[in-house]
């Protein structure tokens, strides 16, 4: 059989200009799931191709002619696109459609309206039986893998869209339980691969000629001693790439040996969740860090030549507009290389989603494609949805000023100063595009801008229900 894996993306992200901007942010890379699952099917004798819409065009007209099974990896923001493609496939061919991923794990019945079968959770142990028809249930529960060393390495030979950086997932899950995060719920419990197994995968990528690498772990430095050992082995065995990206936490700043090893092993770009400079907000999301940790982490990263991507969550219940501005000011003060402002997004299956639904605070008129951490999909406590949406763009524009590009160039090198200047340009293009969209009736931004009536109606309905109940 011919099996095609598709990682869909939203409409804007398929625009060449957006793809070019994403390339400035980081190297083209592909999520590991389809490459692992596809490799399992390939070794069983099937013809397999993997496509990532974010990284290139997909010729569906050609694929429809000879594909037996389409497999979609779905997150919340890409669900409408996945459903659209699934419906088109059913209309124009006899191919089967399978779906898996974070969103369909949380919303399986919704996905079954478009897919022939849905796999929830981890799919490695069931994918072959599902594809070959031995498992016929429409809803298939994946089986968590206890020993991650049993998971085969991603097979990049089946990837048909462009790639520059290899992705390594050395753990699954996260030992922390932030209330807005889907990972610790999709991939529980937290598990680690052995250091030997990780190093073996890195050797493969060196042989394949990759110059860039990403650790996909939600927190690569959660186990500091393990992270140190991986770095030592990378250095000793010549497995140092031009640049390796990773996710970290503020507490890595407390370990000088770890910071030195990260730098020497070229793990020189890190995303750290600052989230907020309001301690009450940090405590409310169970972040487990304090403001002093955040400052130390920023200073330590600059000292060791590690470029910090500061992630700030906008719209937490205890945060005011001033708190958000203070967080972005702080990111500038510690010379963060990039800012990732993320609008609080209530993803299905998370405590935040349950809270927002229970409190009747969701913007009902938006579909899943707006759940992209760039769009406001709920009623914040301390401002209107549109105020928060405007803050998202204002803070990005404020952080990415052209003048700071020169300083970044001095701190990290000319290449990164130029990239920072391009970030500033693209941010302004994005702000301008959002401004135009907010005036187009029916667009997501227009809906966010005009939601006051909705929440007034909701409040009136709630009051009416209370009156009826007490009568």
Question: Can you describe what each PLM-predicted range is?
Answer:
Residues 8, 53, 102, 218, ...:
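Cofactor-binding loop segments of dinucleotide-utilizing enzymes, especially the Rossmann-like FAD-
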Residues 1-212:
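Acidic, low-complexity intrinsically disordered segments
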């Amino acid at each position: 059989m011919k099996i095609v894996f598709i990682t869909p993306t939203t409409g804007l992200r398929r625009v060449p200009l957006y793809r070019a901007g994403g390339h400035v942010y980081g190297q083209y890379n592909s999520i590991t799931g389809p490459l692992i699952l596809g490799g399992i099917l390939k070794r069983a004798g099937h013809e397999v191709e993997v496509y990532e819409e974010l990284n290139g065009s997909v010729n569906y007209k050609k694929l429809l002619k000879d594909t037996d099974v389409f497999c979609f990896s779905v997150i919340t923001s890409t669900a409408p696109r996945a459903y659209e493609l699934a419906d088109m496939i059913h209309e124009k061919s006899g191919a089967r459609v399978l779906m898996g991923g974070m969103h369909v794990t949380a919303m399986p019945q919704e996905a079954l309206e478009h897919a022939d079968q849905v796999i929830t959770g981890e799919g490695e142990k069931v994918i072959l039986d599902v594809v070959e028809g031995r498992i016929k249930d429409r809803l298939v529960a994946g089986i968590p893998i206890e020993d991650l060393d049993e998971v085969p390495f991603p097979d990049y030979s089946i990837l048909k869209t462009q790639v520059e950086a290899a992705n390594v997932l050395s753990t699954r899950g996260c030992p922390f339980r932030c209330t807005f995060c889907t990972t610790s719920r999709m991939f529980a419990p937290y598990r680690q691969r052995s250091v030997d197994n990780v190093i073996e995968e890195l050797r493969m990528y060196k042989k394949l000629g990759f110059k860039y690498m990403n650790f996909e772990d939600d927190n690569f430095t959660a186990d500091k001693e393990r992270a140190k050992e991986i770095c030592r082995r990378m250095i000793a065995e010549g497995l140092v790439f031009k640049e390796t990206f990773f996710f970290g936490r503020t507490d890595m700043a407390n370990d000088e040996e770890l910071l030195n090893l990260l730098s020497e092993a070229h793990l020189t770009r890190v995303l750290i969740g600052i989230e907020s400079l309001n301690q009450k907000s940090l405590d409310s999301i169970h972040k487990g860090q304090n403001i002093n940790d955040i400052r130390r982490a920023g200073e330590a990263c600059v000292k060791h030549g590690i470029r910090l991507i500061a992630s700030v969550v906008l719209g937490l219940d205890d945060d005011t507009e001033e708190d958000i501005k203070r967080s972005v000011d702080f990111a500038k003060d510690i010379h963060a290389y990039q800012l990732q402002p993320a609008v609080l997004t209530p993803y299905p299956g998370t405590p935040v989603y349950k809270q927002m639904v229970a409190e009747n605070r969701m913007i009902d008129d938006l579909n899943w494609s707006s759940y992209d951490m760039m769009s406001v999909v709920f009623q914040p406590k301390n401002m209107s949805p549109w105020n928060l949406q405007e803050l998202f763009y204002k803070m990005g524009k404020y952080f990415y000023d052209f003048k700071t590009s020169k300083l970044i160039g001095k701190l990290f090198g000319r290449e990164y100063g130029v990239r920072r200047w391009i970030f500033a340009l693209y941010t302004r293009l994005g702000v301008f595009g959002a401004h135009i969209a907010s005036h187009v009736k029916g667009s997501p931004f227009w809906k966010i801008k005009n939601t006051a009536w909705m929440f007034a109606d909701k409040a009136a309905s709630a009051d009416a229900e209370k009156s009826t109940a007490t009568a």
